[in-house]
Each structure stands twice: as structure tokens, then as C-alpha cells.
Amino acid sequence: MNKLVRQLLDLNELEFGVDRVHPVVFDIDALIKNVVDSSSILVEQNHAEVELADELNDVCNVYADEFMIEQVFTNYFTNALHYCNDGGKVRVWTANKDYDQPRRTEDGLVTGNLRVFVYDEGPNIPDDELDKVFIKFYKVDKARTREYGGSGNGLSIVAASMAAHNKNYGVYNVENGVVFYFDLDIIQQDDGEPEMIPENNADNTSEQ
């Protein structure tokens, strides 16, 4: 119950703007690996095979609220572990796309969009349920939710966190599994002065 109460408090703060976004520069690859490493017991309990893409061995600085993004990735990763088949794979990878025009922030130059993907090898989500899984308390498979002790709030926190960042997130089915994703701004800390556009006019919407 304590976990449920904490999730509800976090969600209410996000929904009502109490917990504002505090963007900082951090290495998203390091964050991902830290979350995966700290989840080793859960990985073992769910007999999952975790695969991290080669690009996660590099440094990729992003500009976002580090605490919120850690929550987002942790929710995606633990959700994937819970719903992958016994002995199934959970795969994490990223893809980036440069913006047509960079934009300057006080911490550096935002140059592109990074999309983080989390795949689990398990049953698909029914197509008519895909747009509902981020709704508070909603669960596709209620019996399975009870088995894992889920409250239905983890993905709602993802939705609220990404909405606070004004960044894309979502889910889609693939053969033999499900992929969740979210987007972040890539930032470079340098002394250059390339052509800039005002931050409120930047096109941060990546292709789906």
C-alpha cells in the first residue's frame, strides 16, 4: 500500500503541476545501465534475458529532469520484466534524429531528439487497448495485474512525466512482443555559436 500511495502522490503532483520539471544535463546511457544493474534480482526472478544495444556503451547527454526520466525508464523496464515470457528477452536500444535547427539553452545547445525503446518478448496488447494503457488505474489483463501486484499507475506516471517535458511517448505491437518508447532532447555543451531559434519555436516532434 505504501508504494501505491507514493505513486498516487507522485501522479497528483505531476498532473497538477506541483512538481515542475527541473532540466539538467545527464548521460541517459549511464542512467539506463544503472537502472538495469540495480534490477538484477527482479531480472533473475522473472527469468528474463536482458539485451542492451551497443550504442548504450557510449555517452549520450540529454536535457531533462533526471529524476522524472529515471522513473519513466524504471517503469518501462520493470513492466517489460513482468510481462515478458518465462525466459524471454527484454531489449533496450536508442535512435536519434538531428533537429533542422538547434536551440540554445542556459546549459548548452539542443541538437536533436533521442528515442529510447524498451521491448519485451511476450503477448501483444490488443490493438483497441493500445491507446488506453497509459490511463490511470487501467490494466489490459487484470488477472495478470493481481499476479504481479501492479496498481495500474506506473504507465500513468510515464504519461504525466513526458507530458510535463512536452515530449513524445507511446507503445506499439511487434511480432512476438511489445515496444514502449519515449523521447528526449540531445544536448551538446560547447562554446560554439551556431544559428539558433527561440526555444518556444523549436520543433521537438519526432516521427512516430
Predicted feature descriptions by range:
Residues 42-53:
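Short conserved segments within the C-terminal catalytic ATPase subdomain
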Residues 166-174:
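Glycine-rich ATP-binding loops of the HATPase_c
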Residues 16-21, 59-64:
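Conserved micro-motifs of the catalytic ATP-binding
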Residues 87-102, 106-110:
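Short beta-strand/loop element within the Bergerat-fold HATPase_c
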Residues 125-139, 197-198:
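Short conserved segment of the HATPase_c
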Residues 22-37:
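A conserved beta-strand-to-alpha-helix junction within the catalytic ATP-binding
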Residues 80-81:
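Short helix-loop "hinge" at the ATP-lid/N-box region of the Bergerat-fold HATPase_c
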